[in-house]
Amino acid sequence: MSTQTEESQVSLSEVHRSVAIPRNVGLLKRMLAFAGPAYLVSVGYMDPGNWATDLEGGARFGYQLIWVLLMSNLIAVLLQTFAARLGIVTGRDLAQACRDNYPKPVGYVLWVLCEIAIAACDLAEVLGTAIGLNLLFHLPLIIGVIITGFDTFVFFLVQNYGIRRMEAFILVFVGIIGVCFTAELFFSKPDWMGVAGGFIPRLTPESLYIAVGILGATVMPHNLYLHSALVQTRMVEQTEEGKRAACRFNLFDTAIALNAAFFVNGAILVLAASVFFRNGLVVTEIQQAHGLLAPLLGTTFASLLFAIALISAGQSSTLTGTLAGQIVMEGFLRFKIRPVLRRFLTRSIAIIPAVIVISLQGDGGSYTLLILSQVILSLQLPFAVIPLLKFTSDKSIMGPFANKAWVTVLGWIAALVIVALNANLIVDTIRNWIASAGPNAFWLWVTVVPFALACAFLLIYVAMPKSWRERRRPAVPLQIPAISKVPQHYSVIGAAIDYHTPTEKVLSHAQSLASQHHAALYLFHVVEGAGGLVYGKETLDEEARADQEYLEAIASELRTSGLKVTPVLGYGRVTTELVRLAKEHKLDLLVMGGHGHKYLADLFFGTTISKVRHELGIPVLVVK
């Protein structure tokens, strides 16, 4: 169609406003109706990448970095609350808000950075699941990495059952992880006084790299995009009171879900500190941690729970990572592809480097990749946090829901902490690279240094007040567009007839519209068999003759109601022929039936409707 529908402008259109909020019920039932989005977000805070940084932090520095986890969790609650408020109040997710408020080139760069972060997160999920399969079933890591490519189908099946079923599915994984680590804490018998001392802030140059990794693993940039879209699955009353209630319930949901994630992360770090640091063991990979748990704790049950929790973490993060990728691509680019294909693409990007590194460095390379993936996430974080903070503090975007002054100050303190830690890490890393590069340092000066400076300038730009830069357009229209009072008239209407679609309904709608508008009606059917594909109009096979007789019979029946009906056969590919026939006969409207493909059928056969709709500049009425 030539115009964009309202559905194409919303986040996750398949589930947008699909969950009803009951009225005149108790507080608990209303809270449960809003519960869910934060739990989908929370699994990203306990994915395998967190395990790598938490394990190394606990094994190398004991309980010393617990305060970093606490700070990261508080920052996460604050930022995720901002993201939820943005989605509830404006009806726009963070990616759409960036597209609305920044020039296209800046939006494209922000999109690329976000895609890199999602790929880094997916890399952690691939490696985590593969390691879990290796620990549980003794599969080689490379085989495990390849197997993770097939979890795309799991996502596809779960998504088709609706957002509430998906939330329940994820909650099961969260519960499994929580139970496993509660048992691990019981087995490890930590020093609780030492745990309490870990909440006192202190940081050394050696622990900075791990601290930034923990920050990147705990506060994940793509989760901000995800949360701002997921809250729109609820049918929130579009009044100030309704939005305020939704913001309160989502704050409660976020606090509970992210504190559950904090418990899991804290349990991993405490487990590593009480088992490995206490025994003077330096853990360099997850497999090593798994192997040491049984002899050190005196039970094989500890190792089994560890592997089960790791697989659960990887698989639950897979689902939410795909949703985030879909939101980012649609929000920044207005480009929509099937989620399952999006999953294949993202997973392929993650699998390739994993296979290469494991092939070259062996199983030990997987742990290095996990740590690196979390640092990449942390470095991308400011490019999501600062726009979010600016949008939610802007009264022209949020109206009466804009952040209060003290909340804005807290937000900027969190943003400055993130930027300062990242800047320190980047400067130290580049300095070390140059110092160890020798004669090749020149290439670092002309590639890496300019890239880092460009990123710094981009960050300054997105942080600038809107009065210093031109906004592309407001997040919502400032005035209602003029609507023509002249009724739409259709002179020529086409109906696409297919044995596999609801033919009776298509004909009923086409007949009704043709009668109402006194329009000429064309009946189209495309011969898809071998004869039609190879010989086109020259085909005279039994299928073509039967199709011709079928169309003539329908046309004769419709003519009895006084309509001018013309049956037309097409030959070859359905989409190409329907577009050609519609243009040849100068249609004003095309009526089609939906196939209703589900699951794998829709992936492999595709949708004729979507392809025809994008090729034609006329309205297309889809009948199911």
Where in this protein do the model-derived segments appear?
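Loop-to-transmembrane helix boundary motifs in multi-pass membrane proteins
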Residues: 104-107, 142-145, 256, 303, ...
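Glycine-rich, Arg-bearing micro-motifs that act as flexible, cationic patches
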Residues: 592-615
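Extracellular/periplasmic helix-exit of transmembrane alpha-helices
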Residues: 77-89, 231-241, 259-288
